[in-house]
């Protein structure tokens, strides 16, 4: 129970911002968010594209053109997947650089939170002991009443209600006092910890967006290398796409010529 109280108390002091540190999650970098959004977008476009292609190919014009767009889409999807796979090492390189630059800040923040846990532990132990004592006293006071429940009449129910009400109200008030006392004991740590947490998280966010000159230089260098390595990959993708575009253009031209001959 004490471990649960410690965790809840720290989350109460710091807010949900500290969640990733207690769960030992790596903070999501801007690159992570961009990649996740890109993956979702590509999957959505792919699913929507298949539906549209299926409807088009089943139409009269689609059957006449016989473009086999579904097959071409699968080929293009494979090419796009290959491009994304080839980009993965470069993405990891930039991500690892960001994590390395923010490692010290994240370690400092974890240390601050651990120090606060140790400082508030005595208050939580005291709160837990008092709470347990109050509940036990309440249980003992109710034991005779529970015995009377075995033989109830309407009159006895009303009498028992009169007995229980003041006891329940007294216990409720005492437990509220314990919670209020705990809140007052933790209050001095709340402002300091929130300020430290906000400061550290702000520094991490700033590291995630290349603003410092040193970090800017690193990112520019990495992006320059990435652009050089990606150029042939993008060119290969464009070359894969060109035949399908030319095929579509030629078939449309043939269809227009056929329509003109029919109308002549």
Curated annotation (Swiss-Prot):
Sequence repeats lie at residues 67-88, 89-110, 111-121, 122-143, 144-165, 166-187, 188-209, 210-231, 232-242, 243-264. Its main location: secreted. It comes from the Eukaryota. It is found in: Secreted. Keywords: Cholesterol metabolism, HDL, Lipid metabolism, Lipid transport, Repeat, Secreted, Signal, Steroid metabolism, Sterol metabolism, Transport. The keyword Transmembrane helix does not apply. GO terms for molecular function: amyloid-beta binding; apolipoprotein A-I receptor binding; chemorepellent activity; cholesterol binding; cholesterol transfer activity; enzyme binding; heat shock protein binding; high-density lipoprotein particle binding. GO terms for cellular component: chylomicron; endocytic vesicle; extracellular vesicle; low-density lipoprotein particle; spherical high-density lipoprotein particle; very-low-density lipoprotein particle. Major protein of VLDL, HDL, LDL and in chylomicrons. Expressed in a number of tissues including liver, small intestine, lung, kidney, heart and muscle with highest expression in liver and small intestine. GO terms for biological process: adrenal gland development; amyloid-beta formation; blood vessel endothelial cell migration; cellular response to lipoprotein particle stimulus; cholesterol biosynthetic process; cholesterol efflux; cholesterol homeostasis; cholesterol import. SUPFAM superfamilies: Apolipoprotein A-I (SSF58113). Residues 1-18 form the signal peptide. Residues 67-264 are annotated as: 10 X approximate tandem repeats. The keyword GTP-binding does not apply. Belongs to the apolipoprotein A1/A4/E family. Participates in the reverse transport of cholesterol from tissues to the liver for excretion by promoting cholesterol efflux from tissues and by acting as a cofactor for the lecithin cholesterol acyltransferase (LCAT). This is Apolipoprotein A-I.
């Amino acid at each position: 129970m004490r471990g649960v109280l410690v965790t809840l108390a720290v989350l109460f002091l710091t807010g949900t911002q500290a969640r990733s540190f207690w769960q030992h999650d790596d903070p999501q970098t801007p690159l992570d968010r961009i990649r996740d959004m890109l993956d979702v977008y590509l999957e959505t476009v792919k699913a929507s594209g298949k539906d549209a292609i299926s409807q088009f190919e089943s139409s009269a014009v689609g059957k006449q053109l016989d473009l086999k767009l579904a097959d071409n889409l699968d080929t293009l999807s494979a090419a796009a997947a290959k491009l994304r796979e080839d980009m993965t090492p470069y993405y990891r390189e930039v991500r690892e650089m960001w994590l390395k630059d923010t490692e010290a800040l994240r370690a400092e923040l974890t240390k601050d939170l651990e120090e606060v846990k140790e400082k508030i532990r005595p208050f939580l132990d005291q709160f837990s002991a008092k709470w347990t004592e109050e509940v036990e006293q309440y249980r003992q006071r109710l034991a005779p009443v529970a015995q009377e429940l075995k033989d109830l009449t309407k009159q006895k129910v009303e009498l028992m209600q009169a007995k229980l009400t003041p006891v329940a109200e007294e216990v409720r008030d005492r437990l509220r006092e314990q919670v209020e006392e705990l809140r007052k004991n933790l209050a001095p740590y709340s402002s300091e910890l929130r300020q430290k947490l906000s400061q550290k998280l702000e520094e991490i966010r700033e590291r995630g967006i290349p603003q410092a000159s040193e970090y800017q230089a690193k990112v520019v260098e990495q992006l320059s290398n990435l652009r050089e390595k990606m150029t042939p990959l993008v060119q290969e993708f464009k070359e894969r796409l060109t035949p399908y575009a030319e095929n579509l253009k030629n078939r449309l031209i043939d269809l227009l010529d056929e329509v003109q001959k029919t109308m002549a």
